[in-house]
Design a protein with these regions (language model features):
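C-terminal catalytic subdomain
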Residues: 2-21, 25-113
Length: 113
């Protein structure tokens, strides 16, 4: 539902990598899983506060993330982010959460300001 969308504001810097997705993505993958798809496409160095390189192929990164999310959504014994949240709320749930999955990967490039 549009009224239930999670909206945030961030101050972006040059070369920041932005991953946007539907609940089908974030209910099934942890940040570490997403990084495993980004890092093979990344040339440069990074830390939690600095990004110095470029993604070689944002489409390949997005495809990897979507595919991994779909794979995890169908695993019945996986402790997904959704399952973890459900269990913390007292609702017994185990496995991924099959859902539609939308992923957008972009990298900020301020040279065209």
């Amino acid at each position: 539902m549009p009224y239930a969308a999670y909206e945030t504001t961030h101050q972006l810097r040059d070369k920041d990598i932005v991953v946007m997705g539907s609940d089908g993505l974030f209910d099934n993958l942890y940040t570490a899983d997403i990084l495993e798809c980004l890092l093979p496409q990344y040339s440069g160095t990074y830390s939690t506060s600095t990004v110095t390189g470029l993604l070689r192929d944002v489409q390949a990164a997005a495809t990897c993330i979507a595919s991994r999310s779909e794979e995890k959504s169908n695993q019945t014994s996986y402790l997904s982010p959704f399952a973890r949240g459900a269990m913390e709320a007292g609702v017994p749930f185990r496995g991924g959460k099959p859902d539609d999955i939308t992923v957008i990967v972009a990298q900020v490039d301020f040279k065209y300001q």
